[in-house]
């Protein structure tokens, strides 16, 4: 229809209705002013004038122009239809994109929440636990080292006390041997016994348990008459009693040392077992820390991807809104243009059916002849 209309308008462009003709009222002239703004209005008036000038029937003219107006109405209806379809597509697309954006925002929130409230606290907790395990290992080794040093010191003390006891027992045995041979002891022999007692006292000076007994024994040895067999037996008995006590003490020292060594070895086993457990726990915790670090990296990558996806969706939504806004502007402009043309067409058709238009055509024909 547009091609036909353009061709016809080109043909009719050489003709124009004389709006200053006396047949037109002021209202008609206002209508002409509005119609002139419309290509279709001008076309209908010029077409109507030409049709009537060539002997056409007004009823036929009305029919043809009505068909043209109907075609305009159909085209406008198609514009409305296409815009309605575009609106449906737009609404569905916006609904889809907004739902996807909402879902993506929820994914972004969940990813950030998982990172902030799970992975980071877990990382800090694992680091603190690993630090505690390493401190436990260090403390375990310090405890073992201290126990080893203490055991060595205690054993050295044991050996020192054993040497002291053996030295004292040896002196006692020597004194007993001397005393057993005495019948009429000489001053030299008595002094040797007294010297042995002093030696015993020096050997056992750290053992207060024996000091009082040895001191008493020294006093007896100094004051006793070794020629007196009763006094001699008393001294022998005292020496033997002291020897028994020293042997008992030595046996107790040996038993205590064996028990201490046994306890130490058990403690070493326990500490080494604890150390092995700590080491295994470090391996496990290190693996957990590595897994946590990998998960943090994956989550940060996921957050980047989700943000990129969200930006893409927002971009698509903005593009759709912009495209629809442009389509709406085009639609409104098109509808406005069609309405203007239809309004002008109806006004032109109304003028064509006025008796004044027929009078105008007749006057134009008379003027031509």
Swiss-Prot record:
It is found in: Trichocyst. The keyword Cell membrane does not apply. Two components are produced by post-translational processing from the precursor peptide. GO terms for cellular component: trichocyst. Residues 17-55, 190-225 form a propeptide. Disulfide bonds: none annotated. The keyword Signal applies. Residues 1-16 form the signal peptide. It comes from the Eukaryota. Keywords: Coiled coil, Signal. Residues 56-180, 262-354 form a coiled coil. Structural protein that crystallize inside the trichocyst matrix. Belongs to the TMP family. This is Trichocyst matrix protein T1-B.
């Amino acid at each position: 229809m547009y091609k036909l209309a353009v061709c016809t308008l080109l043909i009719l462009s050489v003709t124009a209705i004389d709006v200053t003709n006396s047949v037109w009222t002021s209202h008609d002239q206002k209508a002409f002013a509005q119609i002139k703004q419309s290509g279709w209005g001008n076309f209908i008036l010029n077409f109507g004038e030409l049709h009537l000038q060539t002997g056409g029937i007004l009823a036929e003219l009305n029919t043809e122009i009505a068909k043209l107006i109907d075609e305009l109405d159909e085209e406008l209806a198609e514009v409305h239809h296409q815009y309605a379809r575009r609106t449906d597509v737009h609404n569905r697309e916006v609904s889809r994109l907004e739902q996807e954006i909402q879902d993506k925002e929820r994914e972004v929130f969940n990813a950030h929440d998982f990172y902030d409230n799970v992975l980071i606290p877990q990382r800090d907790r694992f680091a603190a636990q690993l630090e505690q395990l390493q401190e436990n290992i260090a403390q375990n080794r310090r405890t073992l080292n201290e126990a080893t040093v203490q055991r060595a010191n205690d054993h050295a003390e044991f050996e020192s006390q054993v040497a002291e006891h053996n030295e004292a027992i040896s002196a006692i045995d020597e004194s007993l041997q001397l005393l057993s041979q005495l019948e009429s002891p000489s001053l030299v022999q008595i002094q040797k016994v007294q010297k042995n007692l002093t030696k015993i006292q020096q050997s056992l000076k750290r053992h207060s348990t024996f000091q009082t007994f040895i001191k008493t024994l020294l006093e007896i040895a100094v004051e006793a008459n070794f020629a007196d067999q009763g006094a001699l037996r008393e001294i022998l008995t005292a020496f033997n009693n002291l020897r028994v006590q020293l042997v008992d003490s030595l046996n107790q020292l040996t038993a205590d040392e064996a028990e201490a060594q046994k306890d130490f070895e058990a403690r070493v086993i326990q500490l080494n077992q604890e150390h092995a457990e700590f080491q295994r726990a470090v391996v496990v915790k290190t693996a957990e820390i590595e897994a946590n670090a990998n998960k943090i990296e994956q989550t940060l990558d996921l957050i980047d991807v989700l943000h990129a996806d969200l930006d893409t969706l927002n971009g698509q939504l903005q593009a759709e809104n912009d495209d629809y806004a442009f389509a709406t502007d085009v639609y409104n402009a098109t509808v406005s243009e069609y309405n203007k043309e239809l309004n002008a067409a109806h006004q032109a058709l109304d003028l064509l059916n006025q008796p004044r238009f027929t009078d105008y055509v007749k006057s134009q024909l008379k003027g031509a002849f």
